[in-house]
Amino acid sequence: MAQLLDSPGFIERSAAVPHKAAAAPATRDAAAPAAVPGAAVSFELVGKVFDGPRGPAAALREVTLDIARGGVFGVIGRSGAGKSTLLRLVNGLERPTSGAVRVNGVDVGTLDERGLVALRRRIGMVFQHFNLLSAKTVAQNIGLPLKIAGVPKAERARKVDALLDLVGLAAKRDAYPASLSGGQKQRVGIARALVHDPALLLCDEATSALDPETTQSILALLADINRRLGLTIMLITHEMEVIRAVCDTVAVVEQGEVVETGPVWRVFGDPRHGATRALLRTLAHDLPADLAARLRPLDGAAPLPCGAQLLLDVRYTGASGGEPDLGALTAALARNVGDAVHFVHGGLDRIQGRVQGRLVIAASLAARGAASPDRIAAALAAARRHANRVEVLGYV
């Protein structure tokens, strides 16, 4: 498909001029971050304030963010965090109160109505709700933006047929929305978003109204479109499973601020902000209630009682990039604290080619009797050579 915004001057070639009602851009401090060359979208110290019944309310605060061209960028946060506002700034549905939003280097806030129309024709948008016209067929729904743009009928038909093949709905060409499943309706919405050959696709909670199985099929379709067409995708969601399944990079938004950003594997494997850890809670391998109820803390220098099982929390963050050697890990523990070492809880996952996760390991002390603090410390030191983090939870 045609590349979006062929050069930084594409908007100007679409007859854009500075918006007459817009104030002149404020002079930025010399230390303010500049747009990253080659970035599809850049947010530079962006703030957005809405007038509420109780006075001004800040939806975004000094957001600085760069979205690389050709990737799938996820934005996640709780309800009301500012995610959708961030998205609406990209296609000019909202204007920033401060800062600048740049698409391929062009400041969206300086565009007049003609410039915004040119911009929006090159940015696809997929919504949470399908917004299909019930009285029109699948093909007619997809082709409507082309008809409005004055594209000839024969060309529209060719384009619609190609998009139907792309989203797997060729057999539903003449069907009406009432006969479609939720996933099929969203596929129509995705096809419609691609009619103007965009290279930037915005997805606002595109799977939140779908069941888990259908969600996975839509995410697989988005990933396929990203690979085949080279689209940059900016995806808004409140589900960490969606981020894990399809995104390359993620930004966590909390109360209008971007509190954490990075490759998905790093943010999932080593979350650094409380908001990120809270969002990941649904995917965390928390200690089961039966183990938590029996868990006892270590008592300083006192050895463990005979028959106790030492519980260790073993974490793989993906930072090493290699495959975990679980055999070496258990052997190191067995040499130091117990002959019987086994896994009691947890799991490992692979994200962007990196293995990460949490394992709770029990080392039985029955065969050796009491284990001294020195022996436990030696076991931890040995185990840490085979994992990113190893900590003692206590004993049962």
Curated annotation (Swiss-Prot):
- GO CC terms for this protein? plasma membrane
Per its UniProt entry, what is the enzyme's top EC class, as one word? translocase
Question: Which top-rank group of organisms is this from?
Answer: Bacteria
Q: Which UniProt keywords apply?
A: Amino-acid transport, ATP-binding, Cell inner membrane, Cell membrane, Membrane, Nucleotide-binding, Translocase, Transport
Please give the InterPro entries that the UniProt record associates with this protein.
AAA+_ATPase, ABC_transporter-like_ATP-bd, ABC_transporter-like_CS, ACT-like_dom_sf, MetN_ABC, MetN_ABC_transporter-like, NIL_domain, P-loop_NTPase
List locations, semicolon-separated.
Cell inner membrane
What the entry lists under SMART domains is as follows: AAA (SM00382), NIL (SM00930)
| Limits of the ABC transporter domain | 41-280
Q: Where does ATP bind?
A: G77, R78, S79, G80, A81, G82, K83, S84
Q: Where are the transmembrane segments?
A: none
Q: Which SUPFAM superfamilies match?
A: ACT-like (SSF55021), P-loop containing nucleoside triphosphate hydrolases (SSF52540)
Q: What is its main location?
A: membrane
As its record notes, the protein acts as a catalyst of: L-methionine(out) + ATP + H2O = L-methionine(in) + ADP + phosphate + H(+); D-methionine(out) + ATP + H2O = D-methionine(in) + ADP + phosphate + H(+)
Topology within the bilayer? Peripheral membrane protein
Q: Which GO terms describe its molecular function?
A: ABC-type D-methionine transporter activity; ATP binding; ATP hydrolysis activity
Q: EC number(s) in its UniProt entry?
A: 7.4.2.11
The role this protein plays is:
Part of the ABC transporter complex MetNIQ involved in methionine import. Responsible for energy coupling to the transport system.
What family does the Swiss-Prot or TrEMBL record give for this protein? Belongs to the ABC transporter superfamily. Methionine importer (TC 3.A.1.24) family.
Complex and partners: The complex is composed of two ATP-binding proteins (MetN), two transmembrane proteins (MetI) and a solute-binding protein (MetQ).
Q: What is this protein called?
A: Methionine import ATP-binding protein MetN 2
What organism is this sequence from? Burkholderia pseudomallei (strain 1710b)
